[in-house]
């Protein structure tokens, strides 16, 4: 085995991970090392489903010889991570599932049509990003479709809360130049429900990427098929940056968040919440709630508030608060 070397996890699979050694050419597939994870790093498996994810900085060793195989010996401290609860079912129901680590920005991709715009998913991810300290942005895709929702009111709502927004079409190329400029030189992730066009956007930004794209409607119901089988960081040589493409997710959990914390993920509530009659106001039906008054006056977007109310019902009450 070689001495410990630093590297970046660029692909996560069921049993092995591809690591790019520091200093190697990201465009050179021959530079990648296929690594297992040392058993001692799995000691937290009862609490965490995946000990290693794409974006992780690691120390690894490599076997002597041409096979380019090795082992991850250490996972370096993460600056951030996006997590969700393990999807329901099986023994891992309540375990944490980290999706990607060390992001510079998480882009939430939603479609303006086919499938229809999903504001609840969009607002869920934005709240999760704020809770976990990750910069986020919004990509409104499929603007070229004749039945597309008007993007300008949406752009106004999200830009008003300091969230960058790109209105794009992977088919016509509309808006891609501005998006490419924001991707340069950093690590980003695309997250979105199945069928919104994440893989198509990546292929339009960097032609030649080996992505399998399924047409919306292949399985009926206006939803695309899950086309990405492994979480992977893609190097975009024209951009000189990394973009993560993760398998389509039908649910993104607000991992570790309690009800009283949700309003922190809706930044437009903050200035109004200071005027609520009760300090522990959850902004539902409490008397003297300044947030609901602001919604009625049109000072807070009604759809954003509807997302907040729906998400609030999903979250647990802090045990300490429940005992008071």
Where do the PLM segments sit?
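Accessory interdomain/linker segments of ATP-dependent helicases and helicase-like nucleic-acid enzymes
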Residues: 1-23
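Helix-rich effector regions associated with P-loop NTPase G domains
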Residues: 3, 15, 31, 40, ...
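A short macromolecule-binding patch
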Residues: 26-38
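Conserved beta-strand segments of the P-loop GTPase G domain that flank and frequently precede/overlap
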Residues: 108-111, 139-141
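Charged, amphipathic alpha-helical linker segments immediately N-terminal to NTP-binding catalytic cores
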Residues: 119-167, 308-309, 314
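Canonical P-loop GTPase G-domain recognition
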Residues: 145-196
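A conserved segment at the C-terminal end of the G1
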Residues: 199-211
């Amino acid at each position: 085995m070689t001495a410990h070397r630093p590297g970046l996890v660029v692909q996560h699979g069921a049993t092995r991970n591809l690591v790019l050694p520091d200093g190697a050419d990201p465009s050179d597939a021959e530079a990648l090392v296929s690594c297992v994870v040392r058993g001692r790093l799995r000691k937290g498996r009862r609490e965490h489903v995946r000990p290693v994810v794409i974006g992780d900085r690691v120390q690894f060793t490599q076997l002597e010889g041409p096979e380019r195989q090795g082992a991850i010996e250490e996972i370096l401290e993460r600056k951030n991570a996006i997590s969700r609860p393990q999807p329901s079912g099986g023994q891992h129901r309540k375990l944490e599932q980290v999706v990607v680590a060390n992001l510079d920005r998480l882009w939430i991709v939603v479609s303006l049509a086919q499938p229809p715009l999903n504001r609840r998913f969009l607002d869920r991810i934005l709240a999760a990003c704020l809770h976990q300290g990750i910069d986020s942005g919004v990509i409104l895709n499929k603007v070229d479709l004749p039945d597309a929702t008007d993007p300008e009111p949406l752009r106004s709502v999200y830009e008003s809360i300091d969230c960058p927004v790109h209105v794009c079409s992977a088919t016509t190329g509309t808006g891609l130049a501005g998006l490419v400029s924001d991707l340069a030189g950093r690590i980003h992730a695309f997250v979105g429900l199945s069928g919104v066009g994440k893989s198509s956007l990546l292929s339009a930004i960097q032609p030649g990427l080996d992505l399998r794209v399924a047409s919306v409607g292949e399985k009926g119901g206006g939803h695309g098929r899950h086309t990405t089988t492994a979480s992977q960081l893609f190097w975009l040589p024209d951009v000189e940056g990394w973009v993560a493409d993760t398998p389509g997710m039908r649910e993104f959990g607000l991992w570790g968040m309690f009800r009283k914390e949700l309003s922190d993920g809706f930044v437009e509530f903050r200035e109004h919440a200071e005027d609520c009659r009760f300090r522990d106001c959850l902004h539902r039906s409490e008397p003297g709630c300044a947030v609901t008054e602001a919604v009625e006056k049109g000072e807070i977007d009604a759809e954003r508030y509807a997302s907040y109310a729906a998400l609030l019902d999903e979250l647990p009450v802090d045990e300490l608060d429940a005992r008071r």
